[in-house]
């Protein structure tokens, strides 16, 4: 009898899943994340804020059991903006994401991280 594979996570259709659509140089893909991470709004926000997921274009929330899907990009961008500390500098990509999806008002007072290059 063949050995059965252990399952690390179990898919549940009746929860909200968060798919992160990324785009870079006209190539689009959905970020590959653990199933447990995909059903957590908090982990989705954390992954975007930390840079774990880059080139974020959209965040789609869907529940297969309820046949619902929503573009929650603006909601996620607003949640991120509210967590940013004005005394810290913010990665350019993250600041652009918030500005594009939440609006300019949410980026006022935030500082962009400036990249420094050293001649060598």
Regions found by a protein language model. Give the residues of each.
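A short, charged, amphipathic alpha-helix used as a generic interaction element across diverse proteins
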Residues: 26-61
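Short, mixed-charge low-complexity intrinsically disordered segments
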Residues: 51-92, 104-107
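Intrinsically disordered, low-complexity terminal/linker regions enriched in Pro/Ser/Gly
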Residues: 91-120
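Short aromatic-glycine-(Arg/Gly/Cys) micro-motifs in beta-strand/loop hairpins
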Residues: 5-30
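Residues that form generic nucleotide/phosphate-binding pockets
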Residues: 47-48, 79, 97
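Extended, compositionally biased eukaryotic interaction scaffolds
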Residues: 1-11, 113-120
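N-terminal non-cleavable signal-anchor helices
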Residues: 16, 20-24, 60, 77, ...
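Long, low-complexity intrinsically disordered regions enriched in acidic and polar residues
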Residues: 2-3, 28-32, 36, 97-100, ...
């Amino acid at each position: 009898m063949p050995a059965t594979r252990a399952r690390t996570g179990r898919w549940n259709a009746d929860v909200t899943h968060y798919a992160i659509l990324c785009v870079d140089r006209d190539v689009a893909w959905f970020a590959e994340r653990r199933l447990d991470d995909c059903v957590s709004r908090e982990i989705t926000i954390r992954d975007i804020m930390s840079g774990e997921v880059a080139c974020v274009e959209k965040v789609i929330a869907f529940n297969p059991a309820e046949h619902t899907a929503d573009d929650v990009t603006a909601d996620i961008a607003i949640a991120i903006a509210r967590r940013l500390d004005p005394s810290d500098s913010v990665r350019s990509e993250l600041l652009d994401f918030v500005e594009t999806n939440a609006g300019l008002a949410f980026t006022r007072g935030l500082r962009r991280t400036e990249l420094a290059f050293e001649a060598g």
